[in-house]
């Protein structure tokens, strides 16, 4: 299966020919991915909204999980 979106050859993290991450890359895109690496745990990826707390990166994924916590 695909590890990354190979539709854009400009993505430096993804090999457009194989749709696989390039050697050394942890991720190719996502709110918690920066320069092919997972953003460190606790970094705000989605600011608080209303009564909801900030959503933060896990350090293990490129996705920004919804923490579901009220402030």
Curated annotation (Swiss-Prot):
**What is a GO molecular function of this protein?**
toxin activity
Keyword set for this entry?
Cell adhesion impairing toxin, Disulfide bond, Hemostasis impairing toxin, Platelet aggregation inhibiting toxin, Secreted, Toxin
Q: Which PROSITE patterns match?
A: DISINTEGRIN_1 (PS00427), DISINTEGRIN_2 (PS50214)
Highest taxon in the source lineage: Eukaryota
Q: What is its main location?
A: secreted
| Tissue expression from the record | Expressed by the venom gland.
Which positions form S-S bridges? 4-19, 6-14, 13-36, 27-33, 32-57, 45-64
* Domain Disintegrin positions: 1-71
Localized where? Secreted
Q: Where is the motif Cell attachment site annotated in this sequence?
A: 49-51
Entry keyword annotation includes Disulfide bond: yes
Q: Which Pfam families match?
A: Disintegrin (PF00200)
Q: Does Membrane count among this protein's keywords?
A: no
Gene Ontology cellular component annotations, sorted alphabetically: extracellular region; plasma membrane
What family, per the record? Belongs to the venom metalloproteinase (M12B) family. P-II subfamily. P-IIa sub-subfamily.
How the protein assembles, per its UniProt entry? Monomer (disintegrin).
Any further remarks? The disintegrin belongs to the medium disintegrin subfamily.
Protein name as it appears in the record: Disintegrin horridistatin-2
Organism listed in the record: Crotalus horridus
